[in-house]
């Protein structure tokens, strides 16, 4: 009788363990299927891992989708677009400095993630990231190719270079 009881409890524990594992797996898989509003409802699990890391970063909340960008161009609007790649180290160094500058200037800095929307490389003639582009009447007017100048380097731009670029076109930007 004692052995029967032992087998009964062992089976009960095994069943309980399997049940807990199944519930945990369902919770995990459900979270992976969560849609990202920033990326037009794409499932989080389908995004590049570097993009997933940035989903809650306050410096990467102005994502513009390809159709939205095309619409702005077609409507002949004046606006800035910051082309970046979520896995680009120069972008990761530049974005936290650039976004507050845009906010302080009252400019909406649209961010186009080339890692997620590869067609942007060709459509907007982007060779390197980051690239900041000003569009006037839906046509590219000027661009800055490259990020912040690392200390001790002669390559890249200073904060003042970015401030001047934003100030140059700030008055003509449509929201």
What are these regions (language model features)?
Residues 133-175:
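Non-catalytic, surface beta->alpha helical segment in thiol-disulfide oxidoreductase systems
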Residues 63, 83, 106-120:
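Thiol-based oxidoreductase modules, predominantly thioredoxin-like and allied folds used
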Residues 124-136:
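Structural micro-motif
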Residues 91-92, 119-122, 143-144:
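Extracytoplasmic/secreted cell-surface and envelope-processing proteins
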Residues 1-56, 175:
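N-terminal targeting signals for export/organelle localization
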Residues 80-82, 110-111, 131-134:
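Structural recognition of the beta-strand scaffold that forms the well-ordered cores
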Residues 56, 68-103:
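Local sequence-structure signature of Cys/Sec-based thiol-disulfide redox active-site neighborhoods
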């Amino acid at each position: 009788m004692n052995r029967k009881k032992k087998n009964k409890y062992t089976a009960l524990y095994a069943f309980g363990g399997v049940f807990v594992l199944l519930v945990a797996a369902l919770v995990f898989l459900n979270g992976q299927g969560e849609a990202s509003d920033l990326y037009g409802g794409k499932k989080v699990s389908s995004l590049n891992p570097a993009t997933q890391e940035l989903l809650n970063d306050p410096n990467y909340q102005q994502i513009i989708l390809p159709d939205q960008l095309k619409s702005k161009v077609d409507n002949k609007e004046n606006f800035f677009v910051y082309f970046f790649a979520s896995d680009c180290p120069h972008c990761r160094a530049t974005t936290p400095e650039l976004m507050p500058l845009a906010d302080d200037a009252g400019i909406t800095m649209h961010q186009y993630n080339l890692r997620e929307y590869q067609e942007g490389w060709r459509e907007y003639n982007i060779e390197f990231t980051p690239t900041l582009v000003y569009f006037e009447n839906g046509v590219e007017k000027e661009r800055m190719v490259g990020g912040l100048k690392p200390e001790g380097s002669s390559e890249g731009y200073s904060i003042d270079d970015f401030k001047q670029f934003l100030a140059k076109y700030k008055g003509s930007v449509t929201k």
